[in-house]
Swiss-Prot record:
Function noted in UniProt: Required for mitochondrial inner membrane organization. Seems to function through its association with the MICOS complex and the mitochondrial outer membrane sorting assembly machinery (SAM) complex.
Protein name: DnaJ homolog subfamily C member 11
Family classification: Belongs to the DNAJC11 family.
Modified residues (Phosphoserine): S204
GO CC list: MICOS complex; mitochondrial inner membrane; mitochondrion; nuclear speck; SAM complex
Membrane topology: Peripheral membrane protein
N-acetylalanine: residues bearing it: A2
Coiled-coil boundaries: 415-457
Organism, scientific name: Mus musculus (Mouse)
Subunit relationships: Associates with the mitochondrial contact site and cristae organizing system (MICOS) complex, composed of at least MICOS10/MIC10, CHCHD3/MIC19, CHCHD6/MIC25, APOOL/MIC27, IMMT/MIC60, APOO/MIC23/MIC26 and QIL1/MIC13. This complex was also known under the names MINOS or MitOS complex. The MICOS complex associates with mitochondrial outer membrane proteins SAMM50, MTX1 and MTX2 (together described as components of the mitochondrial outer membrane sorting assembly machinery (SAM) complex) and DNAJC11, mitochondrial inner membrane protein TMEM11 and with HSPA9.
InterPro entries named among the record's database cross-references: DnaJ-like_C11_C, DnaJ_domain, DnaJ_domain_CS, DNAJC11-like_beta-barrel, J_dom_sf, Mito_inner_membrane_organizer
């Protein structure tokens, strides 16, 4: 699958790849690589005006790469932020001989200054749309009541509740943020809404505070205060005080949460809620790369319960997760299981089946699109019917597989190909320039390559017979895919030294005489070479290191 192309992919030269050295290369290795390329590209070695001009351009590029990597400060900047970091304004005021950590802090300071100038243009919109569906007529149908009713052959599926909420943030200064939010809800024909305004201030690196004002048609004015504070590096506390004004008087509320990191992956929470639905809750949450585990216990009025849940995270490109939970309390028991999966770059689709007493069976479908959430709880039955559980489990899976294979996958493939084509059009001039530079480099290498081949032949050493770089098509590829490779035999032979060829872990597109023939797509390097008179062949991914000759590359000619 093609990889996404960043804006800097063409502009950001890989200096390590150009010099063909490791990212951990010593100053001696850098100097040796620089001298070798200087001997190859020095303008004074070429009499032809065109070759001389091409050699001068390549020589300057090699010199620039060496200047950056040979200076500890510029090398540290380049290693962390790339070529763009070197072009950042403000480095001229940075003192020499700073450590990489100090350089990182300086760069972040310069970035903050730029971000503050664009602060007013930022918002962080978040929204939720929830649509409750009553589909109990599918399973809890009483046929004797519908015998004399016209049109009773079709189940009645209704939307019985809806909820919409939205919020935006408006940074006022580097420490102050205004938040505006609103919500609308309706259930069985009765509805209401509210609007809230909050002002948040970051008081220090250890805490922040927030004032909130709200009003609604069903509830009176609301005044709230939220505080957050890091007590220690491993412990923090949050407090939320609220005053709800109504015709019955003032209803105060207080919620306090104390949290502590038990280890690097585990956090313990202790929550006390007073006022509306008073309760004491304790929970332990463990979150690792492969799983998310929660256990909680609540004692409260009117609801007390125990909860245990587990989520397994698959290490795949689609970030698939499966989860299950058990909740038991005074109001019943609920078992819930489900899964979620990333269906596009910004969208995650999930479904869960909830089985409870006395709640019955429900199917919950959720779609997260960027910062927007769409939630559809579908109530199937008030009873524990095996048929409802079966259809709630199998139905979404079948629908997802069908939609993903017939609609989503073709759509994403078409979008990706369209994006790649647009990128190729936008970068056509840059690619053409790099192609011309690569061809010029190959012409400048011809004389050196001739001498290298003569030396290798005299000792029965390493001869590059053929080498190709780019996108190769195999039997599993789609029919409309085309081979997009370039011949890199001469550039690779030029890198042979003492019957050895060593390429570092970096994109080969940055090597002298190479260029990217298929921007944004996966590439490989295939080499057919001869060593000690025996043919060898190897193929490696673009960013994988290569060292030849190797016995494992030998072509078996006995069969």
């Amino acid at each position: 699958m093609a990889t996404a192309l960043s804006e800097e992919e063409l502009d950001n030269e890989d200096y390590y790849s150009l010099l063909n050295v490791r990212r951990e290369a010593s100053s001696e290795e850098l100097k040796a690589a620089y001298r070798r390329l200087c001997m190859l590209y020095h303008p004074d070695k070429h009499r032809d005006p065109e070759l001389k001009s091409q050699a001068e351009r390549l020589f300057n590029l090699v010199h620039q790469a060496y200047e950056v990597l040979s200076d500890p400060q510029t090398r540290a900047i380049y290693d962390i932020y790339g070529k763009r970091g070197l072009e950042m304004e403000g480095w001229e005021v940075v003192e020499r001989k700073r450590t990489p950590a100090e350089i990182r802090e300086e760069f972040e300071r310069l970035q903050r200054e730029r971000e503050e100038r664009r602060l007013q243009q930022r918002t962080n919109p978040k929204g939720t749309i929830s649509v409750g569906v009553d589909a109990t007529d599918l399973f809890d149908r009483y046929d004797e009541e519908y015998e004399d009713v016209s049109g009773s052959g079709f189940p009645q599926i209704e939307i019985n509740k809806m909820h919409i909420s939205q919020s935006i943030e408006a940074p006022l200064t580097a420490t102050d943020t205004a938040i505006l939010s609103g919500s609308l809800s309706t259930q069985n024909g009765n509805g209401g809404g509210s609007v809230n305004f909050a002002l948040r201030r970051v008081t220090s690196a250890k805490g922040w505070g927030e004032l909130e004002f709200g009003a609604g048609d069903l509830q009176g004015p609301l005044f709230g205060l939220k505080l957050f504070r890091n007590l220690t590096p491993r412990c923090f506390v949050t407090t939320n005080c609220a005053l709800q004004f109504s015709s019955r008087g003032i209803r105060p509320g207080l919620t306090t949460v104390l949290a502590r990191n038990l280890d690097k992956n585990t956090v313990g929470y202790l929550q006390w809620r007073w006022g509306i639905q008073s309760a004491m809750n304790t929970s332990i949450v463990r979150d690792t790369k492969t799983c998310h585990f929660t256990v909680a216990l609540q004692l409260g009025i009117p609801h007390s319960f125990a909860l245990i849940s587990y989520q397994h995270k698959f290490q795949d490109d689609d970030q698939t997760r499966v989860k299950g939970s058990l909740k038991a309390g005074f109001f019943g028991t609920i078992v819930e299981y489900g899964a979620e999966r990333k269906i596009s770059r910004h969208s995650v689709l999930g479904a869960a089946v909830s089985i409870g007493v006395p709640q019955g069976v429900s199917l919950k479908v959720k779609l997260n699109r960027a910062s927007q959430t769409y939630f559809f709880p579908i109530h199937l039955t008030d009873q524990l019917l095996p048929s409802a559980v079966f259809y709630a489990t199998v139905g979404p899976l079948v629908v997802y597989l069908a939609v993903h294979r017939l609609i989503i996958r073709p759509y994403l493939r078409a979008q990706k190909e369209k994006e790649l084509e647009k990128q190729r059009e936008n970068t056509a001039s840059d690619i053409l320039q790099k192609k011309q530079e690569a061809e010029a480099a190959v012409r400048l290498m011809q004389e050196s390559v001739r001498r290298i081949i003569e030396a290798e032949e005299s000792r029965m050493g390493l001869i590059i017979v053929n080498a190709w770089y780019g996108k190769f098509v195999n039997d599993k590829s789609r029919k409309n895919e085309k081979v997009k490779v370039i011949d890199v035999t001469v550039p690779l032979q030029c890198l042979v030294k003492d019957s050895k060829l060593i390429l570092t872990e970096a994109s080969k597109a940055g090597l002298p005489g190479f260029y990217d023939p298929c921007v944004g797509e996966e590439k490989s390097l295939r080499v057919l070479y001869q060593f000690r008179g025996v043919l060898h062949q190897v193929m490696v991914p673009d960013s994988e290191a290569l060292r030849i000759p190797k016995q494992s590359h030998r072509i078996d000619t006995d069969g």
